[in-house]
From Swiss-Prot:
Gene name in the database record: SSU1
Binding partners and assembly: Heterodimer of the large LEUC/IIL1 subunit and the small LEUD (SSU1, SSU2 or SSU3) subunits.
GO term, biological process aspect, one: L-leucine biosynthetic process
Protein name: 3-isopropylmalate dehydratase small subunit 1
Pfam families recorded: Aconitase_C
Organism: Arabidopsis thaliana
Phenotype of the disrupted gene, per the record: Embryonic lethality when homozygous.
Main location: plastid
Length: 251
């Protein structure tokens, strides 16, 4: 099943690793699955298939994609923010599928940043951040592979990361867990924004943008493509269940 998903859709082939046995994909239950399964959008649409396939429903070219908007404060970081800075290894024992540990995981998001970052992403003693949009430079999410990295950002309350480029494993984990939108900017937005700026991210096929209301500047973002519906659904397993690609948890 996983192999057919990958061959049918190039984006999924970058976000889903095939298991050794076909049956293991259907029975595997990741600790990184969101516990609030009701978060799957009611207007969920399967990925657009470039070729005829019974596994996908082709969306009409005339049918507009729903615009998704995130509005809030920005938290700005630089280049090469690695996963140790996003969530230090000492907190990897927390299990995101446990609601209490999921919330606690969010309180440690970006706690590994150096002291040069005077403003904490999550204030000491708080469980959530006041920053809903993270703006970074090149190679965001580099370092060791850990699903906790995008999960902790989503648990803290972040909705999107806008960076000049990503480490591929962080991008894949962001899509697979469905926690945050990893969006690519066409210019170095991190050099023109400041932590605390008020911004809006608008996602729509072909014309995604970031608007910095504090400076009045607007930046074009690269389309996230077919990865968008997977994140909307809450991750790759929630997406596959919703699309009927694997049995639902209740089956």
């Amino acid at each position: 099943m996983a192999a057919s998903l990958q061959s049918a859709n190039p984006t999924l082939s970058r976000t889903l690793a095939s298991p050794n046995k076909p049956s293991s994909f259907a029975t595997f239950r990741s600790p990184f699955l969101r516990f609030n399964s009701t978060s799957v959008a009611s207007n969920f649409k399967p990925l657009v298939s470039r070729e005829a396939s019974s596994s996908f429903v082709t969306r009409s070219a005339a049918e507009p994609q729903e615009r998704k908007t995130f509005h809030g404060l920005c938290y700005v970081v630089g280049d090469n923010i690695d996963t140790d800075q996003i969530i230090p290894a000492e907190f990897l024992t927390l299990v995101p599928s446990n609601p209490e540990e999921y919330e606690k995981l969010g309180s440690y998001a970006l706690v590994g940043l150096p002291a040069s970052y005077k403003e904490r992403f999550v204030q000491p003693g708080e469980m959530k951040t006041k920053y809903s949009i993270i703006i970074g430079g090149e190679n965001f999410g580099c370092g060791s592979s850990r699903e906790h990295a995008p999960v902790c950002l989503g648990a803290a309350g972040a909705k999107a990361v806008v960076a000049q480029s990503y480490a591929r494993i962080f991008f894949r984990n962001s899509v697979a867990t469905g926690e945050v939108y990893p969006l690519d900017s066409e210019v170095r937005v991190c050099d023109e924004c400041t932590t605390g700026d008020v911004a809006t991210v608008e996602l729509r096929e072909g014309d995604s943008i970031l608007i910095n209301h504090t400076t009045g500047k607007e930046y074009k973002l690269k389309p996230i493509g077919d990865a968008g519906p997977v994140i909307d659904a809450g991750g790759i397993f929630a997406y596959a269940r919703k699309a009927g690609m694997i049995p639902s948890a209740a089956a």
